[in-house]
C-alpha cells in the first residue's frame, strides 16, 4: 500500500523533499503552500556548499543552465568598518562535479518545482 505524504511548505526544503520522495519512493505526496503562487522574485541570493550540490545533483541539479549559477573561487570577509579580515579559497572544497555555488533563490525554486513534474 502506497503511503500518502503531506509536505507543508513549497520553499527550498519542501520542494527538495518532494523531489527525493519522487525519485526514491513510490509514495504519493502533495505539497501544500499557504500562498497562492510561489514567489519567484529576482534578487534573493543563496549560497550552496559543495556537499549541498552533491545532494542536489542526485535530482539533476548538474543539468541546470550554467548561465544561472556562479562558482566563486574565493570568499572575502569584511568587518563592519568594511575592512577585509580574510578570504577563503573555495577551490580546495570543490570537486569536479560539486562546486561551491551561488544563485538566485528563485532559480533554485524554479528548478525544484519543474523537476517534480518531469
Go through each PLM region and give its residues.
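Active-site loop of classical SDR/Rossmann-like NAD(P)-dependent oxidoreductases
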Residues: 44-48
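Conserved N-terminal helical subregion
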Residues: 2-5, 22, 49-118
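Hydrolases whose catalytic domains are alpha/beta-hydrolase-1, hotdog thioesterase
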Residues: 16-17
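A detector of helix-start/N-cap boundary segments at the beginnings of structured domains
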Residues: 41-43, 98-99
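Glycine-rich FAD pyrophosphate-binding loop
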Residues: 20-42
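Short, solvent-exposed loop/turn segments at secondary-structure junctions
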Residues: 12-13, 36-37, 53
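Beta1/beta-strand and adjacent pyrophosphate-binding region of the FAD-binding site
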Residues: 1-13
Amino acid at each position: 500500500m502506497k503511503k500518502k505524504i503531506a509536505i507543508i511548505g513549497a520553499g527550498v526544503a519542501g520542494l527538495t523533499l518532494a523531489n527525493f520522495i519522487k525519485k526514491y519512493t513510490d509514495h504519493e505526496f502533495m505539497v501544500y503552500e499557504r500562498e497562492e503562487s510561489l514567489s519567484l522574485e529576482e534578487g534573493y541570493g543563496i549560497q550552496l556548499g559543495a556537499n549541498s550540490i552533491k545532494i542536489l545533483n542526485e535530482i539533476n541539479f548538474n543539468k541546470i543552465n550554467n548561465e544561472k549559477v556562479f562558482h566563486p573561487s574565493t570568499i572575502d570577509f569584511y568587518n563592519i568598518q568594511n575592512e577585509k579580515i580574510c578570504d577563503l579559497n573555495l577551490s580546495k572544497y570543490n570537486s569536479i562535479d560539486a562546486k561551491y555555488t551561488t544563485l538566485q533563490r528563485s532559480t533554485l525554486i524554479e528548478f525544484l518545482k519543474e523537476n517534480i513534474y518531469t
